[in-house]
């Protein structure tokens, strides 16, 4: 039984797949988004104990997401190759949503850390803005409204760093590792479906090439068989005539590849003719039992 014969049509698995991509995964992603909001709130307010608990709860949601994505993988691997394009179209939206949610969660903390470092390193520069003509009024220096607003928003947006002596610092590292693993799982899942489709396309190309080769090979074998059959009586006559008698009889059949003979030149020729007819009948029987291979021209026309 071939690998594809063990798989099933998409319509048989579609209800289960739709349940995951329409209900299960979106529910997990919504729960993860709420964890992200709570984490941001507790970290901004420096409520480290609550933040630690939220990190743990978010980690459980991430693990549930990973488990559900693996279940979808198992279902997708059972789908027949004919339905892979439709399957890919079906799962792409939820895959992209999961990837974006994971990246957003990781990016929030990353940007906050980088911004805090930038504020620390550039503290003196921020206190002494560059001078321009438009910024000097009556000898007093003023920052532009846009720059002041930007600095204010940056300070509000950036989350405070978690103290290393807090449990929340360690729990964040664990959650971060889980999020990265989830992101990699989503990427691998996407590559799995794409690689299956590429494999099918490659197989189709090889099948087309093989069909051309088989078609040409069949023609060449037919020609060779005809030449071989035509040579059998002549070779039988020549060797049978040279040897003569019962030995010539056997030699005539040896050339044809079968032990039978009639002896002498004429008998050698006759032996070759008999074998020619026998092989001809075998070829006709074999040819009639084999299905005709469709030519590439017929395939293109159809």
Swiss-Prot record:
Primary location group: endoplasmic reticulum
Taxonomic lineage from the root: Eukaryota, Metazoa, Chordata, Craniata, Vertebrata
Function: SNAREs, soluble N-ethylmaleimide-sensitive factor-attachment protein receptors, are essential proteins for fusion of cellular membranes. SNAREs localized on opposing membranes assemble to form a trans-SNARE complex, an extended, parallel four alpha-helical bundle that drives membrane fusion. STX17 is a SNARE of the autophagosome involved in autophagy through the direct control of autophagosome membrane fusion with the lysosome membrane.
Source organism of this protein record: Homo sapiens
GO molecular function: protein kinase binding; protein phosphatase binding; SNAP receptor activity; SNARE binding
Protein name: Syntaxin-17
Similarity section: Belongs to the syntaxin family.
Modified residue annotations for N6-acetyllysine: 41
Membrane topology (UniProt): Multi-pass membrane protein
